[in-house]
């Protein structure tokens, strides 16, 4: 996986007319099937130049010969040199956007857990960086970033020298990482004692399993929806289904819920939720945990009298590929139907989806179909999308959606 010799000609690509149009419209991906000409074989992470049919400069991107997503666009417009200053300016632009939301990178305020780099939408395609207090978690989704890893570490070390950096890898590149002596969960800069980090979100303390947890250790993308739930929880009995480590549960408790139930099939997740409550002893709400399959548990309790005033349905992705889309849409409807059976009159249903293959319109219609079948009157409180640190700059990056409904 070495870089090509310096004497090798620049890697040049020509792409289909449709791909040209997509690039000009700001889309950051070029698929293998769209490459029409290539002057030579390329190595992972090479900077390849894309030309249009008239031999005019179109883009520069990261090349990955092992992925059907062959090129991830870094720059379009006029030709430029992607030197150290270019990379530094791009990172600083992303950090400035976060500073407007959370303060400087090295500040420790009410929220020191957030997304620092959101892949393509921040101009770093195939790379995300999340911050948890004094730890940065860098997750790679393409082998094209391996040759640039040292550069990224140097850039962050110059801006946050006391932070540790943990490397996380998508499954598809783990084997190639091993060839380079890298592995998922590896501390590649600084020091980290243990596998977990305690960070703050809106003043609440949470534990993130940064070396082996889901995503980068916590579901940071639901922060704004957690805040919304907090504002709706006073005096309510709250059910947090697919609770994972209890994010919604803690916000509901701080919002004045009378009791909160965290429901998840994973005993490990429920233990994590209990640890997070222990980190926040000021929360007075009764917290219960239930280990069960949500799809089975919700309808099984119909008519039991164990009703809730606020039900949160936040499952993991139900469609990881396009072939699973129709089944996921049906599953979202089934979940909403089950949640409604446990929702008391006047209660609030919060349904969320993180499946990129299911559009916001398809998801909301699945939920609303279940609502209409229930025969209950309803009022839509709001629909929500991405948090500002998880902004999406192109259609495929839009995955998160939620709908808040109040039922009679």
From Swiss-Prot:
It comes from the Bacteria. GO terms for molecular function: methyltransferase activity; RNA binding. GO terms for biological process: methylation; rRNA processing. Its EC number is 2.1.1.-. Pfam families: Methyltrans_SAM (PF10672), PUA_3 (PF17785). It catalyses: cytidine(2499) in 23S rRNA + S-adenosyl-L-methionine = 5-methylcytidine(2499) in 23S rRNA + S-adenosyl-L-homocysteine + H(+). Keywords: Methyltransferase, RNA-binding, rRNA processing, S-adenosyl-L-methionine, Transferase. Belongs to the methyltransferase superfamily. PANTHER family: RIBOSOMAL RNA LARGE SUBUNIT METHYLTRANSFERASE YWBD-RELATED, SAM-DEPENDENT METHYLTRANSFERASE. This is Ribosomal RNA large subunit methyltransferase DR_0049. It comes from Deinococcus radiodurans (strain ATCC 13939 / DSM 20539 / JCM 16871 / CCUG 27074 / LMG 4051 / NBRC 15346 / NCIMB 9279 / VKM B-1422 / R1).
């Amino acid at each position: 996986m070495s870089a090509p010799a310096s004497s090798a000609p620049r890697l040049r690509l020509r792409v289909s007319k449709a791909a040209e149009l997509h690039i000009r419209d700001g889309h950051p991906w070029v698929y293998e099937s769209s490459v029409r000409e290539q002057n030579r074989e390329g190595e992972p992470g090479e900077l390849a130049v894309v030309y249009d049919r008239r031999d005019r400069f179109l883009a520069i991107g990261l090349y990955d010969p092992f992925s059907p997503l062959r090129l991830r666009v870094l720059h379009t417009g006029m030709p430029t040199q992607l030197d150290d200053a270019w990379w530094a300016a791009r990172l600083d632009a992303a950090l400035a956007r976060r500073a407007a939301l959370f303060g400087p990178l090295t500040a420790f305020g009410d929220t020191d857990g957030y997304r620092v780099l959101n892949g393509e939408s921040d101009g770093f395609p195939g790379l995300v960086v999340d911050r948890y207090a004094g730890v940065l978690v860098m997750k790679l989704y393409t082998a094209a970033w391996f040759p640039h890893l040292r550069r990224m570490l140097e850039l962050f070390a110059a801006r946050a020298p006391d932070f540790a950096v943990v490397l996380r890898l998508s499954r598809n590149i783990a084997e190639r990482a091993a060839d380079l002596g890298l592995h998922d969960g590896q501390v590649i800069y600084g020091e980290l004692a243990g596998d977990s980090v305690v960070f703050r979100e809106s003043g609440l303390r949470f534990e993130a399993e940064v070396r082996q947890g889901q995503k980068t250790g916590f579901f940071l993308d639901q922060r704004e929806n957690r805040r919304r739930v907090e504002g709706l929880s006073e005096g309510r009995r709250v059910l947090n289904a697919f609770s994972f480590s209890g994010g919604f549960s803690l916000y509901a408790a701080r919002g004045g819920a009378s009791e909160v139930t965290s429901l998840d099939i994973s005993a490990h997740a429920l233990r994590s939720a209990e640890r997070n409550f222990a980190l926040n002893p000021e929360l007075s709400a009764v917290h219960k945990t239930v280990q069960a399959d949500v799809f089975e548990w919700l309808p099984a309790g119909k008519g039991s009298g164990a009703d809730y005033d606020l039900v949160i349905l936040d499952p993991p992705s139900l469609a990881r590929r396009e072939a699973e889309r129709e089944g996921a849409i049906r599953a979202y409807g089934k979940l909403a139907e089950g949640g409604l059976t446990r929702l008391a009159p006047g209660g609030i249903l919060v349904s969320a989806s993180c499946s990129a293959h299911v559009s916001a319109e398809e998801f909301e219609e699945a939920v609303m179909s279940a609502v209409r079948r229930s025969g209950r009157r309803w009022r839509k409180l709001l629909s929500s999308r991405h948090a500002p640190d998880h902004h999406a700059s192109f259609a495929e990056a839009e995955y998160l959606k939620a709908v808040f409904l109040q039922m009679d």
